[in-house]
Amino acid sequence: MAAAIGLRVVGRRLGLGLGRTPRRALWGGHSKKEEKEVEENSIIPQEKKEPSLICPPPRSRKYVPPENIQSILEARVKEICGPSLAGNWLQTSLKDNRLKYQLLAQLAAELGHAVPNSQLHLMCSAQDVLTFYSTPVKDMLKFDELCAAELPPNLKIAWER
């Protein structure tokens, strides 16, 4: 080991090139100047815009459950499960992903309100689906709630329209 290191040192001093190979030989010889020229040519100038303080469009998340949601859900569960349905349809298990998808897709299309991805794992039975679709969703952002609330006299929120 010591002999190999000594040979390299002697080779460098004599200029024999026994040491490490130059970087250009290892990586194709590209220089940083060439890379900078290519990058400068590929950059497209973008216009800087002022941040917009316009009120964002309202999201269509509002959902009011229909009065007959239980009968709608019962009909869909019986339609999908067929004759294999147990006595109590609310206890119908949704462990089969195909069954769960069919039920939730039909309800989302019919009611216009889909189960978000973050809550799909919570839908284990028809009772869970009934609980989700029985819960109303209001369509107000926090800023809208602040505008509607009684604020102190030194605080006012106004959107540019």
UniProtKB/Swiss-Prot annotation:
Pfam families in UniProt: Ribosomal_L50
InterPro entries with a match to the protein in the record: Ribosomal_m50 (IPR018305)
UniProtKB keywords: Mitochondrion, Ribonucleoprotein, Ribosomal protein
The keyword Mitochondrion is annotated on this UniProt entry: yes
Renumbered residue ranges of the record's region Disordered: 27-51
Domain of life of the organism encoding this protein: Eukaryota
Gene Ontology cellular-component terms listed: cytosol; mitochondrial large ribosomal subunit
Subcellular location(s) of the protein: Mitochondrion
Presence of the UniProt keyword Transmembrane helix in the record: no
Assembly information from the UniProt record: Component of the mitochondrial ribosome large subunit (39S) which comprises a 16S rRNA and about 50 distinct proteins.
Family stated for the protein in its record: Belongs to the mitochondrion-specific ribosomal protein mL50 family.
Protein name per its UniProtKB record: Large ribosomal subunit protein mL50
Gene: MRPL50
